[in-house]
């Protein structure tokens, strides 16, 4: 049971003491039990630390915790602490110890109550755990570090974005500059400058006058061009004629070096009764062809002339025909020579009308007996003059010789003979002349 406060003491100091320990449901007083004499029991006070179970015997000596090593520190504290003193400078041990069980000293009971009220507060401050303070400090430090790192990362990201945007802007500006420079150079060099064009505007009459003058200039240029074209054509024709004459002169040179008895100048002639008919063109241009340089309607006697040039030939119809040459006398024939211009000088660009396969016959005086002298092939690609040896063995003299053409080199309408030569030995010249009635010219 609680004691009534003494006279002169403050009652509020005992009635409103806070409860600092949640385990105790009692008041902040020390749990004391009064005996019959009104004394407190020496039992342990609730909330009192174990280090204060015993105190020193002498006054002013602080109570030590017997359970700690060394016995020189307070329980729950890392440094030595002294026992609280009273307001008048005396220690708490001036009276009897709290747990000693002795009678109260003669000191004031108010001082003892104040000391008892201060003990739980001092014990609570001494027993506050330090690990919770360190943990809260570390968590705060970690939070600060994480915030700093997040801010640094955000700053780096912003810097990278700025750099990328600047690089993109620089690239775009560079490409645009290159395009504009190329366009400018193209306008300068590809488009003609405008300074060369007239700046004044022409009237309609001036425009017509200029057009008329330019038309007259064009007509003059056209006339001069036609004149130059005619001159070039004439020069080309003269040059071609000169070249043709040189070629014909070269062709007319006698490379055979044998006497020719099929020459009109020595008395040879053509037996027209036994010779094929001439080629006649059925086109309306036949008349003009007879007047032109390229004449297809030459008589067969042209093959007895030494003039060999393109177009100066005897043409007969088809690829088969014959010609009978009357010799100036009886001649023991040994060779026959055919001559045809090469394809390189032909106006038609080829020699398809040249004879290919032919046969040679010797005719007797009665014109009925024919002696076969040989069959030959004229190769137009080989040479323009080709001599063929006859099969006249034993040699016989003939007043006439027949050349029978069996085929040509592909021309479908006609075949051309340019020149035929007959070589051999002439016998009984005067007798043959009297018999044939042919007067020979000078040899």
UniProtKB/Swiss-Prot annotation:
Coiled-coil parts of chain: 203-244
Compositional bias of kind Low complexity: 1-36
Principal subcellular localisation of the protein: membrane
Domain SUN, first and last residues per copy: 267-427
Loss of function: phenotype: Male infertility with severe defects in sperm head formation and globozoospermia-like phenotype.
Keyword Coiled coil tagged: yes
GO BP: cell differentiation; spermatogenesis
Keyword Oxidoreductase: no
Membrane topology annotation: Multi-pass membrane protein
Cystine residue pairs: none
UniProt KW keywords: Cell projection, Cilium, Coiled coil, Cytoplasm, Cytoskeleton, Differentiation, Flagellum, Membrane, Nucleus, Spermatogenesis, Transmembrane, Transmembrane helix
Residue numbers spanned by region Disordered: 1-107
Annotated localization: Membrane; Cytoplasm, Cytoskeleton
Cellular-component GO terms for this entry: cytoplasm; cytoskeleton; motile cilium; nuclear inner membrane
InterPro entries reported for this sequence: SUN1-5, SUN_dom
Annotated PROSITE patterns: SUN
Domain of life: Eukaryota
Pfam families (alphabetical): Sad1_UNC
Tissue: Isoform 1 is testis specific and is exclusively expressed in spermatids.
Residue stretches spanning the membrane: 137-157, 168-188
General function of this protein: Involved in spermatogenesis. Required for sperm head formation but not required to establish and maintain general polarity of the sperm head. Required for anchoring and organization of the manchette. Required for targeting of SUN3 and probably SYNE1 through a probable SUN1:SYNE3 LINC complex to the nuclear envelope and involved in accurate posterior sperm head localization of the complex. May anchor SUN3 the nuclear envelope. Involved in maintenance of the nuclear envelope integrity. May assist the organization and assembly of outer dense fibers (ODFs), a specific structure of the sperm tail.
Subunit record text: Self-associates. Interacts with ODF1. May associate with microtubules. Interacts with SUN3 and SYNE1; suggesting the formation of a spermatogenesis-specific LINC complex; a SUN domain-based heterotrimer of SPAG4 and SUN3 may associate with SYNE1. Interacts with SEPT12 and LMNB1; during spermatogenesis.
Protein name per its UniProtKB record: Sperm-associated antigen 4 protein
Gene that produces this protein: Spag4
